[in-house]
Design a protein with these regions (language model features):
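N-terminal topogenic module of multi-pass integral membrane proteins
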Residues: 1-51
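Membrane-interface transmembrane-helix boundary segments in multi-pass integral membrane proteins
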Residues: 12-29, 175, 193-234
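Short juxtamembrane and helix-loop transition motifs at transmembrane-helix boundaries
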Residues: 13-18, 44-53, 68-83, 101-111, ...
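Structural signature of hydrophobic alpha-helical transmembrane segments
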Residues: 24-28, 80-92, 114-115
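Alpha-helical transmembrane segments in multipass membrane proteins, preferentially the mid-helix core
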Residues: 34-40, 98-99, 151-170
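Cytoplasmic-side transmembrane-helix entry/capping segments in multi-pass membrane proteins
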Residues: 52-56, 87, 111-119
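Aromatic-anchored segments of alpha-helical transmembrane domains
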Residues: 62-71, 118-130, 179-188
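Membrane-proximal helix-loop-helix units in multi-pass membrane proteins
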Residues: 102-160
């Protein structure tokens, strides 16, 4: 039994996960299916007497997914957790936390932040989940990662379809300010801890990812990342802009 837990909660020494394989596509397709079901049943969910319990359950699942990442590190010293890599400084982690509180309180302010964070930062984790290189479908980390990242999208679309939340231009600025605070914290930690690379501002990831196209020069790297975030924010808001424009034309 000890050997099983050591294996399940640990990680391999050779590649166990490859991009754009069934192990990559399956969780994303399942997320899309769940979101589609929420859309189809949005009226029934809104009127259900169990709606609040459902939101609380999803909020609880989000928090457990995030916390279990650190519980695994504490329980598996062989993973060599350290302040260089494992401090809670990241867009994805805080998106999950904010989504959890958003679900409990039906918070529009938190929705404003996480909507743009999901479609400008966490989206890259779905496209190139390089942190799973040594943890395939037979490892706990594989399921923890996918639940943590897909439940955030499910939570946001739940609030859109069931509770009618939507982003605005003001939401984008609010989210950008919160993102800037996170970036400043990550930059400070990267300068204080040798080898730290939070938000991948210091250097590219060790494993191949979309960030490999960025230059090693810090100033140029951060400038390109900032420009990319502006573009991603604009693309995330574009469907709502077009929807509003169409409504104005119909009046």
């Amino acid at each position: 039994m000890k050997e099983f837990f050591t294996y399940f909660f640990g990680q391999g020494t050779t590649q166990e996960f490859a991009l754009f394989t069934p192990a990559h596509f399956a969780p994303v397709l399942l997320m899309i299916l769940v979101i589609w079901c929420i859309y189809r049943k949005r009226d029934a969910l809104r009127e259900s007497r169990h709606e609040e319990k459902l939101r609380y359950a999803l909020a609880f699942a989000l928090i457990i997914c995030d916390m279990s990442y650190y519980w695994r590190l504490v329980g598996m010293p062989s993973l060599n957790p350290s302040a260089v890599e494992n401090l809670p400084i990241g867009i994805c982690a805080w998106t999950v936390i904010f989504c959890s509180f958003m679900m409990v309180g039906k918070s529009q302010s938190l929705f404003d932040i996480v909507y743009f964070w999901l479609f400008s930062g966490s989206l890259f984790a779905l496209i190139t989940p390089t942190v799973l290189t040594y943890t395939g479908p037979t490892r706990y980390r594989y399921y923890q990662f996918w639940l943590e990242h897909t439940l955030g999208y499910i939570a946001v679309f739940y609030m859109i379809f069931v509770h009618g939340m939507r982003p605005t231009i003001r939401s984008a600025f609010k989210s950008a300010i919160a993102m800037t605070v996170m970036v400043l914290i990550a930059y400070w930690v990267n300068t204080m801890i040798p080898g730290a690379n939070y938000l991948y501002m210091a250097r590219p990831e060790a494993a191949p990812s979309v960030l490999d196209i960025l230059p090693p020069n810090f100033a140029l790297r951060v400038s390109i990342m900032a420009f990319a975030m502006v573009v991603m924010y604009a693309l995330a808001y574009l469907p709502w802009y077009r929807l509003d424009k169409k409504k104005r034309q119909l009046k």
